[in-house]
Structures are given as C-alpha cells and as structure tokens.
C-alpha cells in the first residue's frame, strides 16, 4: 500500500547526545523508521582536572558547533533515572543541562529516551550489552568499519531510537493505526 | 593589634546561588569575616509545566542579569552530595550547571559549600534547621524585617558562609595562623 511507503518528507535528522563531562558522545543520523544513514559522530572531551565551569563552557562550545553544523530537526538525549554513584549522576545531569540549554536557545526540540528504550530500539532487547548495541549500530548504519568509542555508538543508538520511536509516537499521537 | 583590624581591601562581594529549577535562590552580600551587608536577594522561578530546555534558558537569563548587575567577586553554590530523590538531584544539578556556566563565561570564580558547612557558618551548628538559618541570616545582616522565602535566605547564608570561610581558607593557604 502506498501509505506504507516512506515519504521523502518524513526523512528526519536526529542528533543524539550521550551526556558526560569527561566524554560526551555525539551521533547524527538521517532517516526514517527502518532506514538510518550516518551523518557524523564525535566525542567531546573535557579535562578532568579543569574547573567544572570551564568544562561546561568547553562542552557548550562543542555542542553549539555540532548543532550549527548538523542542523538537526531534533536532539535526543539519554534520560538517566538512577545510578548508584551520585557524582556520576551529577556530571551526567550537568552535561545534559548544557545540551538542553543550547538546543532550547536555537529552538531545536529535545526528546528523551531511557537506556532500555535505546537498547530495545536497536537490538530488540532492553537489557542488551554495550557490545551488542555497538554491533547493531554499525549494522543498521551499514558502517561495519566505523571506528568510534562506546560513547559515540551510544549517541548514534539514541539518534536511531528517536528515528524509529519518534515516528511511531507521532503516528500514535495522530490517532493512526500502528 | 592592627593586623586584626579588617582591611578595606578585604571587602568582598559574594553572590550565593541555591540552585533549583522551580525556585533558584539568589543572595548577594558584601563584607569580610564578622561583617556582612545585604546587597540584594531574589528567587528566580521557572514554570514546572514548561519545557526543561526553556526553563534552563529562563534561569540562564535571570542569572546573567544578576551577575551583570551585582558583579560579584565570587559565586558560592550549594554542593549537593546526596539526596533520596533522583529527580530532585537532577533538577539541582541542571540548575547548578547553568549557574556554573554563566559564571565561567564571565570569568567569575565559583566556590562550593555543603549544606552543613553553610549551617555551621551562620548558626554554629551543622544540623541547624531552616528556621534557625533564616533567623541568623536576618540577624547577621541586621535585617530583622527582611521578607524573603527560604530559598532566598539559604542563598544569603551561602554567601555569608563564603565571606567567613573563604577568608579563613585563604589565610590557611597563605600559611598564616588561624
């Protein structure tokens, strides 16, 4: 049925952000449910021995460059519900706040996905391991040789998750059949 | 002894920030150990039903206005070590990140104090209650009629704590007697 063919207008660009102070993963993909193309990938680093404010400012600079360069339709950020280490939660929250802030300043909508939503979207299993997520990201993007650390493949998985789920949620919101 | 007289050059202006998304307390004081003068106090509100990114952007606007207007020598922020509610920790961390970011962008140093350090500085007791902190803030600032909510008096207490402790830490760092 024609209604099931992907429409060119439905192609979206998503920038996934795996927030972190020491390593912040960035992954940009284009596509629609079932097809994702790699646009760009990066890991922003800030030195652990620098002042926290300077680290956040450096992170802001990097995120602004990526937002302006990639011009995504939407930014997808990992939603952290609970972690054992309060220090890690704080760093993740602080880095995530900067991503949110720069996206809001540019009028780019931000969506959130939990780690299990992301894992389920790319592997079919909400408790998949890091290696399996990285393997499936490379397969889905048809980039088997992609050299990228886990923070980067996690950000790409977030972006792919939004391509898949975002469209499904939009259909549900519009009252369409699934 | 002359060495114990406060030196005009030691007068510092501190802006205390009690970070929060729904209510962010701001308190600015001038002084030196033993004397604190109220400069300004405010609570920044952001609507709980707004997008998180827009809330952070509104908070940034308010903090920038206060930083530019008050021109503090240093910003003191509450250091959160642990809270039971992860959602509250995240909001505090996100709001604190914005305060850090805007201070770093303007080259204003940021210092951290734990709630118990703040309580001990203004009441002599690290486990003092909110009412006791608010009472002592009004007494120390000689502003018994100050109408300000707890978020604002907490921010003032943070600023006073930095006036007291900051000088002591600077003396210790310089190798002087306590």
UniProtKB/Swiss-Prot annotation, chains A, B:
Keywords (A to Z) from UniProt: Cytoplasm, DNA damage, DNA recombination, DNA repair, DNA-binding, Endonuclease, Hydrolase, Magnesium, Metal-binding, Nuclease
Enzyme Commission number: 3.1.21.10
UniProt xrefs under PROSITE patterns: RUVC (PS01321)
An example molecular function term from Gene Ontology annotations: crossover junction DNA endonuclease activity
Binding positions for Mg(2+) 1 per the UniProt entry: 18, 151
Residues at the active site: 18, 78, 151
Catalytic function, reaction form: Endonucleolytic cleavage at a junction such as a reciprocal single-stranded crossover between two homologous DNA duplexes (Holliday junction)
Cofactor remark: Binds 2 Mg(2+) ion per subunit.
Cofactor(s) the protein needs: Mg(2+)
One GO CC term, this protein: cytoplasm
PANTHER family: CROSSOVER JUNCTION ENDODEOXYRIBONUCLEASE RUVC
Family, per entry: Belongs to the RuvC family.
Protein name, entry field: Crossover junction endodeoxyribonuclease RuvC
